[in-house]
């Protein structure tokens, strides 16, 4: 289709040759499979589903004098993006939340109840930092050419194309498109920049309920003291860009 578009624009000098088209269809070597890539970025960068976990545990009981209730919960929301945690960077998208709630009611007298309520949650959000923000990953996946570059250079490439400058770096290498690194979705995911955000909330109440049936049946008075706190802060952040490489096939 690209050739058809170029012919319509009379750009005959820039047509892709039949030999090159055959290499895209059936690469003649594993090195040519990198030189003539056919990458489905959506399949390579995303899973077909995202994980979600919810767990909760409750306990309650009491006596004539005291009643109690306690609840703890955990929630996890994953992502369809294929991230990685290799001990150096964590490019996964996820959100974990831990929450708790406790209620204790004391029957101080037949007409007086003092209640203590405490609850809160802690949330941890982890995500990579593509150059164009949170929406940038979709931009790279749907905007990158399938035939411009592979996802990365496997370590075996050094067997066929030795690196005279860094011969000791025998590992998979991120790809730079001729010194321009904004086009490769895999590079954006794995470049090394990620951030972890933590938010915490705490709620506490002390409630006094006094029945006043001696004045009027059903009459009562209630007093309440509440305290709420909220914190949001960056737990971990990296600003290091992992090196990217460009392989000259000429």
Positions of PLM-derived features:
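Flexible loop and strand-edge segments within Gram-negative outer membrane beta-barrel domains
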Residues: 33-73, 77-80, 91-182, 195-197, ...
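Membrane-embedded beta-strand positions of outer-membrane beta-barrel proteins
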Residues: 70, 116, 206, 221-223
């Amino acid at each position: 289709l690209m050739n058809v578009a170029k012919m319509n624009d009379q750009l005959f000098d820039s047509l892709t040759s039949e030999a090159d088209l055959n290499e895209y269809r059936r690469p003649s070597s594993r090195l040519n499979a990198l030189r003539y890539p056919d990458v489905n970025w959506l399949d390579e960068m995303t899973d077909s589903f995202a994980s979600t976990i919810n767990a909760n545990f409750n306990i309650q009981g009491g006596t004539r004098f005291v009643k109690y209730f306690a609840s703890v919960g955990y929630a996890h929301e994953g992502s369809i993006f294929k991230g990685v945690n290799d001990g150096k960077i964590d490019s996964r998208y996820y959100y974990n939340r831990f929450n708790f709630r406790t209620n204790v009611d004391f029957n101080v007298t037949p007409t007086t109840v003092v209640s203590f309520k405490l609850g809160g949650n802690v949330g941890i959000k982890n995500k990579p930092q593509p150059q164009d923000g949170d929406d940038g990953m979709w931009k790279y996946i749907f905007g990158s050419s399938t035939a411009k570059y592979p996802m990365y250079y496997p370590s075996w490439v050094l067997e066929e194309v030795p690196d005279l400058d860094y011969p000791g770096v025998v590992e998979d290498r991120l790809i730079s498109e001729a010194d321009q690194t904004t086009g490769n979705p895999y590079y954006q995911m794995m470049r090394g920049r990620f951030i972890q955000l933590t938010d915490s909330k705490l709620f506490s109440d002390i409630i006094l309920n006094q029945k006043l049936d001696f004045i009027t049946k059903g009459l009562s008075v209630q007093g309440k003291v509440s305290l709420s706190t909220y914190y949001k802060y960056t737990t971990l952040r990296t600003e290091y860009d992992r090196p990217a490489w460009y392989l000259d096939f000429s």
